Every structure is written in C-alpha cells, then in structure tokens.
C-alpha cells in the first residue's frame, strides 16, 4: 500500500471533506495509506511541497499570489476544491438578532490578518456596503492569540474561522452575529495543491478518485 503525506495549513472542521477522505477509509479503498501534519503557525503548507515533506496540502488559493506578484511561476498547482464558501464568522459580546454590518463602523474588531482572511473580510465589508476604514481594526496576532485576546476582554467583535466562534459561544464568551460566506457568495476559498510532477503519478490519480 502506497503512503502519501498530507499537510494542512490550518486544521479545522472547515476542512471536513479532506479529513473525511482520510478517516472514512476512502484512501484505503484506493490502496493508499497516509500520514498528515499541520504547518507551523505563520508558515504556509506550500513550503512542505517545496521541501518534499508533503505530497499534497490544503492551501488557500491566495498563497500563490505573492509569488505571482513577483513575476514568478508558482511551484505548486491547485487541483481540487475543498470548499467554496468563506468559513469565517463574526462574534460579538452579546446576542444581537438585529445585527447589521453597519454596527462594525466605529467598533473595535479583532480581524484575522492572514492574507486571504483579511482580503475576504474587506470584500465582505464592501459587499455589505460599509467602509472598512471606519472600523477600529485590531491585529492581535495569529488565530490562537486573537482568541485569547477576545476572551480577555479586547474588542467588541472578533473575526474567526469556524469552529472557534462556536467554541466561544459554548464557553459563554460571545455570540455569533453573522457569517461572511453568505455575504461574499461562492468563491474559491480553500483547495488541494501539489507539485505538477506528483500529479502525474498513479498515487495522485488514486487520491483524486478518493
């Protein structure tokens, strides 16, 4: 049985299609074994493709933008969709059934400053008809640091990927007031990536079938 190495940029229930492929026996049905890992905070899983430690990774499409902006050709290829909606939510301090995006203007909001999350948040603001620059945006660090900051009383709202917002609710810290996905609409959010040469292998074809 061939073994493939899979790496996640972030490990979250949001990537359940990929997790299910691993844990549901679909890879085994195609004669594949697997090992998986999670990239270190702040490091894209695409790095694991370049150094050979992973065969296939979960990655946002935007992680190739910086290379393209330099006029270079990305070394990896995005070949399979994981999901097609933004998986981030806004959580407030209190339940707000009458929430509107306009309430963000003038409020302190902990916003995820990762490349794609920030870009998508700005686009959601545009789609919702509000001025991003009127929001008191707080950069509290990575996802875990943001979560800690909000739990410690910083910010009126926080922008997080599921299931972190739902955990805040379960812990009595806040209430989810809206999701970004419906505001933005369908988009290429997260996908599978690999190197072109691996995609020519029988293992790659078996993985894609799974």
Language-model-derived ranges and their functions:
Residues 2-130, 137-143, 156-163, 173-178, ...:
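Short, glycine-/small- and polar/acidic-enriched structural segments
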